[in-house]
């Protein structure tokens, strides 16, 4: 198994999860990757913390690489194909670029990399403010390194703490330059995964 895609969800988000799974399955089929990509989902009704759910998923994964997709976000049509191509480099992690919106409003580009600190700054490359973030749960990373970092047993900012724990283990990286992910923060939905 090359890649484990891990998704935390809530019972009340069945429709959003179904849309995401349809897109993931379409991409797996179009890449002829069903033998090398697994999708593992953990759905509950907030019985355990998001961090505990993420750790359960990490422990169930068999892929050499793992990445999380939030059930209320969107992936671009080339997401899986580009990650599978990048995996061939055998780097510790894969730097990615995406779009961040609040309530599907103004689009802001973000970039994830082991080489960044968490900061927002102007990028001449994109002629706009870009959210530069260290590698986090959305970053495809070798599973063995994610297992060393693990998530704290909490539902708020567990991804940020995981990022701080993970980054010291990351020595090598390959970059996907194309947009692959759309993170849409919903100000009206305070439910955690």
Q: Model-predicted segments: where are they?
A:
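The conserved acidic donor/metal-binding loop of glycosyltransferases
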Residues: 70-74
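A recurrent flexible, glycine/aromatic-enriched loop bordering the glycosyltransferase active site
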Residues: 117-141
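Short aromatic/hydrophobic "clamp" motif used to bind/position activated sugar donors
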Residues: 66
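Short, well-formed alpha-helical segments that are part of the catalytic scaffolds
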Residues: 7-29
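Acidic donor-binding loop at a coil-to-helix junction in glycosyltransferase catalytic cores
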Residues: 156-162
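Catalytic donor-sugar/metal-binding loop of nucleotide-sugar-dependent glycosyltransferases
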Residues: 165-182
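Glycine-rich, basic loop-to-helix element that forms the pyrophosphate-binding segment
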Residues: 45-61
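Conserved donor NDP-sugar-binding/catalytic core segment of glycosyltransferases
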Residues: 80-110
């Amino acid at each position: 198994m090359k890649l484990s895609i891990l998704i935390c969800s809530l019972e009340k988000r069945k429709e959003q999860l179904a849309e995401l799974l349809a897109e993931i399955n379409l991409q797996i089929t179009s890449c002829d990757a069903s033998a090398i990509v697994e999708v593992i989902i953990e759905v509950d009704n907030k019985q355990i913390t998001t961090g505990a759910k993420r750790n359960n998923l990490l422990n169930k994964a068999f892929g050499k690489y793992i990445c999380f997709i939030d059930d209320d976000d969107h992936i671009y049509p080339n997401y899986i194909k580009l990650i599978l191509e990048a995996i061939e480099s055998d780097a510790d992690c894969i730097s990615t670029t995406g779009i961040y919106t609040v309530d599907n409003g103004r689009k802001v580009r973000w970039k994830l990399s082991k080489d960044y600190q968490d900061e927002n700054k102007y990028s001449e490359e994109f002629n706009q403010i870009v959210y530069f973030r260290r590698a986090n749960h959305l970053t495809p990373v070798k599973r063995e390194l994610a297992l060393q970092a693990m998530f704290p047993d909490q539902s708020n900012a567990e991804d940020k703490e995981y990022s701080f724990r993970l980054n010291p283990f990351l020595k090598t990286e390959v970059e996907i330059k194309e947009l692959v992910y759309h993170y849409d923060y919903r100000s009206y939905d305070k439910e955690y995964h």
